[in-house]
């Protein structure tokens, strides 16, 4: 994980750690001229590691985004940002995207009153995301929300009620709120 953030830069979804400033100097000395292939590969790897996707999942999202009207890159980022695991991370209900995936897989999360155990579930506007009524589920989410450093910088397309452990998807995400720098 740390080798990945040293090589690709900060990946907020993968870990809260940041690469040290000295590691950039080593990469610049080693790198030389970067080919177009290398630049595209690094950007693809950033997407994969940030969102926790396999190669096949990413290719499916690229295919869906290519068929849709509009900019393929923007639509791809919107599709990835509307995944349930990513929305939990953005709401502050999990510290990382892998942590959010675990919450979803362990059936702690309800979408519109139904248990969803698929992290790649595509949320739609006006979806209500809550925790299971079990005490363990509420305690887990409460700890994450209390320790969440980015509580005040919640994206416009999401709202959270920290006392009821409830999040709401208002609309599809605006491209300026995506925390990942993609070339």
Swiss-Prot record:
GO terms for cellular component: chloroplast; small ribosomal subunit. This is Small ribosomal subunit protein uS4c. It comes from the Eukaryota. The lineage of its organism: Eukaryota, Viridiplantae, Streptophyta, Embryophyta, Tracheophyta. Keywords: Chloroplast, Plastid, Ribonucleoprotein, Ribosomal protein, RNA-binding, rRNA-binding. Part of the 30S ribosomal subunit. Contacts protein S5. The interaction surface between S4 and S5 is involved in control of translational fidelity. SMART domains: Ribosomal_S4, S4. It is found in: Plastid, Chloroplast. Residues 82-143 form the S4 RNA-binding domain. One of its GO terms (biological process) is ribosomal small subunit biogenesis. Gene3D superfamilies: Ribosomal Protein S4 Delta 41, Chain A, domain 1, RNA-binding S4 domain. One of the primary rRNA binding proteins, it binds directly to 16S rRNA where it nucleates assembly of the body of the 30S subunit. It comes from Crocosmia sp. (strain Porto Alegre 034). Belongs to the universal ribosomal protein uS4 family. InterPro entries: Ribosomal_uS4, Ribosomal_uS4_bac-type, Ribosomal_uS4_CS, Ribosomal_uS4_N, S4_RNA-bd, S4_RNA-bd_sf. The gene is rps4. One of its GO terms (molecular function) is structural constituent of ribosome.
